[in-house]
From Swiss-Prot:
Family as reported in the entry's similarity comment: Belongs to the G-protein coupled receptor 1 family.
Organism: Mus musculus (Mouse)
Coiled-coil ranges from the UniProt annotation: none
Domain of life of the source: Eukaryota
Taxonomic lineage of the native organism: Eukaryota, Metazoa, Chordata, Craniata, Vertebrata
GO BP: any one term: circadian behavior
SUPFAM superfamilies reported for this sequence: Family A G protein-coupled receptor-like (SSF81321)
Gene: Gpr176
Protein name per Swiss-Prot or TrEMBL: G-protein coupled receptor 176
InterPro entries, alphabetized: GPCR_176_Rhodpsn_7TM (IPR043523), GPCR_Rhodpsn (IPR000276), GPCR_Rhodpsn_7TM (IPR017452)
Membrane topology label: Multi-pass membrane protein
Compositionally biased residues, Pro residues: 417-426
Length: 515
């Protein structure tokens, strides 16, 4: 990627006061030099924007193809191949041309012959892969439209086609090591200062541009024309095919769906932008190779450097904007990132210790728990009958005492300290006395959930309370008032005997016999 003598104006001497004609010529030369320097700064700025935008855009294309299943696996593979070649071309081609465009005499290590040849080889490879990916996508679109119910290109064939693309690019780029002053589409700098006018150089330039640039672009337009003819013929004949690819309600569908039509428009736009941006490159090749013009204009050279690189930025932008499904996926991802970032800001800016009077969802600081709690309140909202039973429940103190007994699990029941109870004679109180789980006051309870041993989203719904057990509106059978009683189900006893009382107050045990 050596120094190109045409980048620097040869007229760099200061004007002399020899004559008026020479002074005018020197002033005009300085004016041209200042314009060239200004245009050089413009090209450097544009290439920096292209470098950043192409990297971000191609990475987003890779992410969208991996995240969504909008297209088939074969189409996704070709699109990923195009995005990878765009990333490689942006990383390898653009930075060094930015350096040489800003200052041709900087970075002496770039001008070493070995380093320059390796970079030119990589430039050729990635440029060739980008161009050869267009006909591969067009071929896949052609088979998808003409044979929608068949799979002409399998996954194995698509992998082989991608391997052929890279092999073709490598073989077409190997002669760069022998011909050092070759310029490609994405990098116009050369490794030698003087252009060689040998026959081998002319043959290589013609063969490369015909086989790697002109023929692939012509194949793309040929496939697009065939697709258009097939679609127009299907619309005229009103062909109705089974809705296997895009199901609809018994409506005649064309060969290509809206999603495929968007992909066709994307491919056509990419190829059109590539052709328009490559016009300065083709002009420069004709000037330096065919017409053998050694001194070309600085403006033509700088334009041939930055304008073809616009296609590196245009390819991902067109893919992300023209396709509606990909655009929706991208917008949804941005919305998710915004929500996640805003949620983190709310949690980080909140106080470390919450007030005890706040709700559990607000104390936790999690929006997920808050949404769950609100949804639970809406689901288990008490009805009018339940509100009446709640009023009766709050007005009866005896009923509250019974509710305390029934709300505690077995083995943990303790009668309320309302009055000392005396056990009947001849009985032994074998149940252990355990203090309740939560201290309870003898006053009126604040709400109907105060007797339940739950917290937050684990509070029991009103349909499971004892006053509504006989109602038809309950959701589940009354297995208990606490989660422990819900889990502990009683196993029915087998071969239970019957006890009958006789006239002499004697208990007789009769075994139960199956009749």
């Amino acid at each position: 990627m050596g120094h190109n003598s045409s980048w620097v104006s040869p007229n760099t001497s200061h004007p002399r006061n020899t004559s008026g004609a020479e002074a005018g010529a020197n002033l005009s030369a300085f004016g041209e030099l200042s314009e060239a320097q200004l245009y050089r700064q413009f090209t450097t700025t544009v290439q920096v924007v292209i470098f950043i935008g192409s990297l971000l855009g191609n990475f987003m294309v890779l992410w969208s193809t991996c995240r969504t299943t909008v297209f088939k696996s074969v189409t996704n593979r070709f699109i990923k191949n195009l995005a990878c070649s765009g990333i490689c071309a942006s990383v390898v081609c653009v930075p060094f041309d930015i350096i040489l465009s800003s200052s041709p005499h900087c970075c002496w290590w770039i001008y070493t012959m070995l380093f320059c040849k390796v970079l030119k080889f990589l430039h050729k490879v990635f440029c060739s892969v980008t161009v050869l990916s267009f006909p591969a996508i067009a071929l896949d679109r052609y088979y998808s439209v003409l044979y929608p119910l068949e799979r002409k290109i399998s996954d194995a064939k698509s992998r082989e086609l991608v391997m052929y693309i890279w092999a073709h690019a490598v073989v077409a780029s190997v002669p760069v090591f022998a011909v050092t002053n070759v310029a490609d589409i994405y990098a116009m700098s050369t490794c030698t200062e003087v252009w060689s006018n040998s026959l081998g150089h002319l043959v290589y330039v013609l063969i490369y541009n015909v086989t790697t640039v002109i023929v692939p672009v012509a194949v793309v337009f040929l496939f697009l024309i065939l697709i258009r003819r097939a679609l127009s013929a299907s619309q005229k004949k009103k062909v109705i095919i089974a809705a296997l690819r895009t199901p609809q309600n018994t409506i005649s569908i064309p060969y290509a769906s809206q999603r495929e039509a968007e992909l066709h428009a994307t491919l056509l736009s990419m190829v059109t932008v590539f052709i328009l941006c490559s016009v300065p490159y083709a002009t420069l090749v004709v000037y330096q190779t065919v017409l053998n013009v050694p001194n070309t204009s600085v403006f033509l050279l700088l334009t041939a450097i930055w304008l073809p690189k616009v296609s590196l930025l245009a390819n991902p932008v067109l893919f992300l904007t023209v396709n509606k499904s990909v655009r929706k996926c991208l917008v949804g991802t941005l919305v998710q990132l915004h929500h996640r970032y805003s949620r983190r800001n709310v949690v980080s800016t909140g106080s470390g210790v919450a007030e005890p009077s706040l709700e559990p969802s607000m104390r936790s600081g999690s929006q997920l728990l808050e949404m769950f709690h609100i949804g639970q309140q809406q689901i288990f909202k008490p009805s009018e009958d339940e509100e009446e039973s709640e009023a009766k429940y709050l007005g009866s103190a005896d009923f509250q005492a019974k509710e305390v007994l029934t709300s505690c699990p077995e083995g943990e029941q303790e009668p309320p300290q309302l009055a000392p109870s005396v056990p009947p004679p001849g009985t032994v109180d074998s149940e252990p006395r355990v203090s309740p789980v939560a201290p309870m006051e003898s006053g009126i309870f604040p709400d109907k959930y105060s007797l339940q041993f739950g917290f937050g989203p684990f509070e029991l719904p009103p349909q499971w309370l004892s006053e509504t057990r006989n109602s038809k509106k309950r959701l589940l059978p009354p297995l208990g008032n606490t989660p422990e009683e819900l889990i502990q189900t009683k196993v029915p006893r087998v071969n239970r005997v019957e006890r009958k009382m006789s006239r002499n107050n004697k208990v007789s045990i009769f075994p139960k016999v199956d009749s």
